[in-house]
Amino acid sequence: MTDKEGQEVKDAPSIEQYTALKDQLTQQILKKQELDSKLSKLEDSIYEKENEYFNESVYGNIVKGFQNFTKTNTGGLNKRRITYTDDDHIFSLSSVNYIKTIMKRQGVNSNGGRNEDLDDYEDSIDPNNGNAGGNTPNTTGTNNQSASQANSNSNQSTPGRKRKIRTIDD
């Protein structure tokens, strides 16, 4: 397209560019959800391994020390179990996400007094058809849509943010 002076003018963003960007966003959201799921499973695995370590180390461990190691036990009657709290899980507590999860499970507000936590929102997409939040506008060219109609349709197909339903397992 050229203007009055014969210089080339760049086209305004087209439906094809919008669709390509929307598809790219959808793929990135799916990838983020997959990585979040893997991270959550890994953090749970680390927590379980810490519990196993605490339970199998009768004579002490690196966190609480080895005081029981040097003491001689009389027939195992004085074997004292060391009690562990969430504060002893030093590897789990090194993860910011895991700390937020624990705080949410305990009902503690972790967002500095704000009413809403932005982590409670998630990007919504339909992974079955790759559609981000709704129907895509008709791009076949057979319908003659005005710009305002295309804009109203594009608002529906933009990925939305919805509040997550929190459960104990989250």
UniProtKB/Swiss-Prot annotation:
Residues 160-170 have a biased composition (Basic residues). Signal peptide: none annotated. It is found in: Nucleus. Residues 14-53 form a coiled coil. InterPro entries: Eaf6. It holds the Pfam family NuA4. GO terms for biological process: chromatin organization; DNA repair. One of its GO terms (cellular component) is nucleus. Residues 127-157 have a biased composition (Low complexity). Residues 107-170 are annotated as: Disordered. The keyword Transmembrane does not apply. Keywords: Chromatin regulator, Coiled coil, DNA damage, DNA repair, Nucleus, Transcription, Transcription regulation. Component of the NuA4 histone acetyltransferase complex which is involved in transcriptional activation of selected genes principally by acetylation of nucleosomal histone H4 and H2A. The NuA4 complex is also involved in DNA repair. Belongs to the EAF6 family. Component of the NuA4 histone acetyltransferase complex. This is Chromatin modification-related protein EAF6. The gene is EAF6.
